[in-house]
């Protein structure tokens, strides 16, 4: 049963990415002047460190990164690299991060910040964006971090029931 759970979750990962993207697009239609990026997927990855080995977890991160790259950037490499690095960071520190709710909330905020800032910097270096850092912070980073803080505040209890 445990193996079935691992394989089933692995097959559903691309759909989780697409659902996350559509949530972001839906929220963006309500707030057209800011760029909201839902990273509900980070909440899933945070708790998934409990269930799978480190290597399988990094495969999860690699697949999510590939799907994310193809769907959003049409350039393979930016989020694949970031997801693998963040996944390794999460898996190494999961015993500390999963101690209580506050550390999970802080981890979600830090993950969102590192991912958004890393993807902005890599996209800027590759030439995919020309926005200045201040525009990015005000109209994208801060609203995204607030949204993801709300996600973990609301959905953390559901994930705790399932995983803990």
Curated annotation (Swiss-Prot):
<protein>
    <recommendedName>
        <fullName>Cell shape-determining protein MreD</fullName>
    </recommendedName>
</protein>
<comment type="similarity">
    <text>Belongs to the MreD family.</text>
</comment>
<keyword id="KW-1003">Cell membrane</keyword>
<feature type="transmembrane region" description="Helical">
    <location>
        <begin position="70"/>
        <end position="90"/>
    </location>
</feature>
<feature type="transmembrane region" description="Helical">
    <location>
        <begin position="106"/>
        <end position="126"/>
    </location>
</feature>
<comment type="function">
    <text>Involved in formation and maintenance of cell shape, probably part of the elongasome which synthesizes peripheral peptidoglycan (PG).</text>
</comment>
<feature type="transmembrane region" description="Helical">
    <location>
        <begin position="7"/>
        <end position="27"/>
    </location>
</feature>
<feature type="transmembrane region" description="Helical">
    <location>
        <begin position="135"/>
        <end position="155"/>
    </location>
</feature>
<dbReference type="GO" id="GO:0005886">
    <property type="term" value="C:plasma membrane"/>
</dbReference>
<keyword id="KW-0133">Cell shape</keyword>
<keyword id="KW-0472">Membrane</keyword>
<dbReference type="InterPro" id="IPR007227">
    <property type="entry name" value="Cell_shape_determining_MreD"/>
</dbReference>
<dbReference type="GO" id="GO:0008360">
    <property type="term" value="P:regulation of cell shape"/>
</dbReference>
<dbReference type="Pfam" id="PF04093">
    <property type="entry name" value="MreD"/>
</dbReference>
<feature type="transmembrane region" description="Helical">
    <location>
        <begin position="30"/>
        <end position="50"/>
    </location>
</feature>
<keyword id="KW-0812">Transmembrane</keyword>
<keyword id="KW-1133">Transmembrane helix</keyword>
<comment type="subunit">
    <text>Interacts with MreC in the elongasome; interaction requires the 90 C-terminal residues of MreC.</text>
</comment>
